[in-house]
UniProtKB/Swiss-Prot annotation:
Stored NCBIfam families: 1-(5-phosphoribosyl)-5-[(5-phosphoribosylamino)methylideneamino]imidazole-4-carboxamide isomerase (TIGR00007), PRK13585.1 (NF010112)
Name this polypeptide is given: 1-(5-phosphoribosyl)-5-[(5-phosphoribosylamino)methylideneamino] imidazole-4-carboxamide isomerase
Gene name of this polypeptide: hisA
Family: Belongs to the HisA/HisF family.
Residue numbers annotated as active site: 8, 129
Organism annotation: Synechococcus sp. (strain WH7803)
Subcellular location: Cytoplasm
């Protein structure tokens, strides 16, 4: 299972939100390029970027930082937040990003996402952010009546690379991921799932590893890395070693 460090950009700085609340911001760095290089040096195989300004307004606001990061790194970079048109996605993919993540537009214009994925196979990711099982959009500000698993099923036969499944209630809390929601998401679609939200310790990563056979292939980690609760290098090593062993029985109780 791949661990993907996250950098959330707000006003050009690296921040984390608590449960997606723009009024609950923790600022970690004013130098996103240096932060990105740090994750790469610690062994990250991919970087996850979020333009929080873009997610809230629909207008790109951190392009200079995004370009600087992609130019500085040698690992693939994926970006979400405010990517709501085919033109914007095409431009980003042509400027060095490996993948673009579409959330709001995936709910509002799913066919556009399918067509974009056909043009860029393996480079389009659908971000499904859920609150109490229902899809939330526009930077998690607006709630819909669409079930997250139902939206995932719409893209099962498409050329998208993956689905990022975020449980908003756990995001930024460090209280553990919503394993049941991730299990349901993985079972609802044949597309690989990337877990996001709630990871706070090594035990959470080991718990997620039990979902890998279902198609949960990676996990995005933010605050736990910044707070030092998880060391990226040590976590990568521990996951690699755990894959060679049977998972602890107590981690499987929820799925018996």
């Amino acid at each position: 299972m791949q661990i993907i460090p996250a950098i959330d950009l707000l006003g050009g700085s690296c921040v984390r939100l608590h449960q997606g609340d723009y009024d609950k911001v923790t600022r970690f760095s004013d130098d996103p390029v240096a932060q990105a290089l740090q994750w790469q040096e610690q062994g990250a195989e991919r970087l996850h970027l979020v333009d929080l300004d873009g997610a809230r307004t629909g207008e790109p606001a951190n392009d200079s930082a995004i370009r600087a990061i992609t130019s500085a790194l040698t690992i693939p970079v994926q970006l979400g937040g405010g990517v709501r048109t085919a033109e914007r996605a095409d431009t980003l993919l042509a400027c060095g990003l490996d993948r673009v993540i579409l959330g709001t537009v995936a709910l509002e214009q799913p066919q556009l996402v399918v067509e974009l994925a056909d043009r860029h196979p393996g480079r389009v990711v659908v971000g499904i952010d859920a609150r109490h099982g229902k899809v939330a959009t526009k930077g998690w500000i607006e709630d819909s009546n669409t079930e997250a698993t139902a939206l995932a099923q719409r893209f099962s036969a498409s050329a998208i690379a993956a689905i990022i499944s975020t449980d908003i209630s756990t995001d930024g809390t460090l209280e553990g991921p919503n394993l049941q929601a991730l299990r349901e998401m993985a079972e609802a679609s044949s597309v690989p799932v990337i877990a996001s939200g709630g990871v706070g310790c090594m035990g959470d990563l080991l718990a997620l590893l039990t979902l890998e056979p279902l198609g949960v292939e990676a996990v995005i980690v933010g605050r736990a890395l910044y707070d030092g609760r998880i060391d990226l290098g040590e976590a990568r090593k521990a996951l690699a070693e755990s894959r060679l062993q049977d998972p602890p029985s107590d981690l499987l109780q929820d799925f018996a």
